[in-house]
Curated annotation (Swiss-Prot):
Reactions catalysed, as given in the entry: alpha-D-glucose 1-phosphate + UTP + H(+) = UDP-alpha-D-glucose + diphosphate
Keyword Transferase assigned: yes
KW Cell inner membrane (keyword) present: no
Annotated gene: galU
Function noted in UniProt: May play a role in stationary phase survival.
Taxonomy of the source species: Bacteria, Pseudomonadati, Pseudomonadota, Gammaproteobacteria, Pseudomonadales
UniProt keyword terms in alphabetical order: Nucleotidyltransferase, Transferase
Uppermost EC category: transferase
GO process terms (BP): biosynthetic process; UDP-alpha-D-glucose metabolic process
Enzyme Commission identifier(s): 2.7.7.9
Family, per entry: Belongs to the UDPGP type 2 family.
Protein species of origin: Pseudomonas aeruginosa
GO molecular function annotations of the record: UTP:glucose-1-phosphate uridylyltransferase activity
Protein name (database record): UTP--glucose-1-phosphate uridylyltransferase
SUPFAM superfamilies in the record: Nucleotide-diphospho-sugar transferases
Entries under Pfam families matching the protein: NTP_transferase (PF00483)
Length: 279
């Protein structure tokens, strides 16, 4: 049973400057909730309640958000504004939160390796804040992936088809279709040029990883810019037939850029906030 979830959140958020100069990008509001809260709620819905967050300099707001604010709660006690804290209170009651700091920005693989002391020798999920995923017609994306892990007991990565001209923005996979939206991965390339891409199936920010990934990351040589990419370690797993890509059900918004962030905000406003539905 997977219970642990790792949230790499040490990045600078340069695509949202100047807003992120003094505020973590993970705290950017989508309607009235910060981006990171959507990911934590998705994890809890999937049964993952041990939340580990890899932070960096200037990210104290993340820890403050997932904590009790006694002064604020006393101020709004007995008013209709209490309803706005119901969601975060649920997370505080049902989840445990732990933190570690990534002192150097050396890629996603390095960020995941930094979280190793918090995870231990267990399978775990990874969610990237930039990707907000929703499914209006069934289980959330992480719930779908947890169910697949329970069946296959191997690394699961969420993928989606992208415009072939945009493969240079993603890790891209190729493999053998085994039905039901599943691909047994045999090749994986980090941000290939369109003419070099093995397919147009791109990995998004949802992973379930087996604990051997840590050793594989340690053995990975830094690439461009001194960064250690998770794609390289995943490819080593894939060569042993231990990685399945999943074409998830639902929608994904790239909140790392202005266009996707605005689309996500409009979507959540129309489908959740405006209608009064929980989300």
């Amino acid at each position: 049973m997977i219970k642990k979830y790792l949230f790499p959140a040490a990045g600078y958020g340069t695509r949202f400057l100047p807003a992120t100069k003094a505020m973590p990008k993970e705290m950017l509001p989508v309607v009235n909730k910060p981006l990171i809260q959507y990911g934590v709620e998705e994890a809890l819905d999937a049964g993952l309640n041990e939340i580990s967050i890899v932070t960096g300099r200037g990210k104290r707001a993340l820890e403050d958000h997932f904590d009790i604010s006694y002064e604020l709660e006393n101020q709004i006690k007995g008013t209709d504004k209490e309803k706005y804290l119901v969601g975060i209170r649920k997370l505080l009651d049902e989840c445990s939160f732990s933190y570690t700091r990534q002192t150097q920005m050396k890629g996603l693989g390095h960020a995941i390796l930094t979280g190793r002391p918090l995870i231990g020798d267990e399978p775990f999920a990874v969610v990237l804040a930039d990707d907000l995923c929703v499914n209006l017609e069934g289980d959330g994306v992480l719930t779908q992936m947890v169910k697949l892990y329970q069946k296959y007991r191997c690394t699961i990565v969420a993928v989606m088809e992208v415009n072939p001209t945009e493969t240079n923005k993603y890790g891209v996979i190729a493999g053998d279709d085994i039905g039901d939206g599943l691909i047994r991965v045999r090749d994986m390339v980090e941000k290939p040029a369109p003419e070099d891409a093995p397919s147009n199936l791109a990995i998004i920010g949802r992973y379930i990883l087996t604990p051997d990934i840590f050793k594989l990351i340690e053995e990975t040589e830094p690439g461009k810019g001194g960064e250690i990419q998770i794609t390289d370690a995943l490819l080593k797993q894939a060569k042993d037939g231990c990685v399945i890509a999943y074409k998830f059900k639902g929608q994904r918004f790239d909140c790392g850029g202005a266009e996707g962030y605005i689309e996500a905000t409009n979507f959540c406003y129309e489908h959740f906030y405006k209608t009064g539905k929980a989300y």
